[in-house]
Amino acid sequence: MEIVKEIFRSYDIRGIYEKELTNDLAYLIGRAFATISKGKIIVGHDARTSSNALNTNFIKGALKSGAEIIDIGLCTTPMLYYAREFFKEDYAVMITASHCAKEYNGFKLCDSNGSMYGDKIKDFLNLILSGNFKDGIGHVSTYDLTFDYKKMIINKITLGPRKIKAVVDCGNGTTCYFNPEILKDLGVSVVPLYCEPDASFPNHIPDPAVESNMVALQEKVKEVGASVGIAFDGDGDRIGIVDEKGNLVKTDMFMLIIWKSIYKTCLNKTASFDVKCSEALKESLENLGLNTKFNRTGHSYLKKAVKENNYDFAGEFSGHVCFNDEFYGYDDALYAAGRLLRILSNTNMNVSDYFLDVPTYYSTPENYIEVGEENKDKIVNAVLEYAESKKYEIIDIDGVRIEYGNGFALVRKSNTGPYITVRFEGKTEEERDLHKNEIMNIINEVRND
């Protein structure tokens, strides 16, 4: 069979079902994963219409290679991560395409080091292409983790005396089956929005990082007078927040709320966040007396950094946040929501009150520019050379982030397509636009060359 190599991406395997990602390929993925695994394999899947078939064929392949399978069935990605803790097994597979459009599906793979990414995905593809699989007779057992996951969340999150009304937008994704009910059990007054499972995503794609997907949540918060709005992505590992006024709270500012609640008691005084985050976050954290450190964008890099540096808390602009002070160090948006609700329920402060002392910056959204695979490195290198010639302060752990002192410019190549991503910021709108125009001129010169 012909394999579309491009669906083996930096962090996962993801493609259009039946066109790029077939049931036959799912079988081979199962054979290959069972070949590299040590111990039992936990497998779960999201609510997409193709997930059951991919799950079945993955298990068939894994059994053919002698795997012992624990099939936890329908779940969110954080539930699969928790299953690794619950069963004390390392190797796990989540069948999901997260926030992608309805025609997509995919596989997230975990080994003894956590989420597999980068060269491990390349090596995994090469194993499939070689066909050098183990043979054996496996066994599959099933387990519904819902009760245990719910019990874990409730044991870790106890709300205070203030009653909180929260609008919860599940975007018709897999979190519909779990998150609203668990939040109700915590004592939250939940106003559901798009909490009916529908794999066609009729209202919006379940991606809270896209501002247009948050408009209905913003309006609903204002309509019902809620304390907060909470959005979950398709598989439950990313969060989006709206304040009591209906304003978007970007993830870097959500992280600031968390840090303000833990900085006095946390053991590790370094706050880590990805290169897309605002200077306002960096300045605010340093004003609290914390050290700050930029990290590469990507949930796999985030979890690796948390584990290696024993950070108490870290996150990235896209909505992945990892708690390691009272939790397991992986990205669970329901737990993240619980931590925010715990803070709010123990104070009379509103969400917006946490930003009254935050320095003002004007930022663009993160924008994707299609440039073709062949131009991604050229553009990043051209911007780097230009910045060096200007003797700008540069952070180059993930593309190029130019630190102007009154804002920044970020240019990095996307790991998921033929794009570069850009973001610009200034202390005034004019300064932001100056930074943007300066760097976009370099980008356009390369594109038009």
PLM region descriptions:
Residues 41-104, 182-242:
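N-terminal small/polar loop signature for handling phosphorylated ligands or for N-terminal nucleophile
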Residues 69-78, 248-251, 273-274, 295-296:
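Active-site nucleophile and cofactor-binding loops and adjacent substrate-binding regions
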Residues 1-68, 91, 142-166:
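An N-terminal, well-structured beta->alpha segment
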Residues 266-423, 429-449:
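Phosphate-binding and adjacent anionic-ligand microenvironments
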Residues 105-224:
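Gly/Ser/Thr-enriched, mixed-charge loops and adjacent short helices
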Residues 92-98, 102, 221-243, 248, ...:
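Glycine-rich phosphate-binding loop
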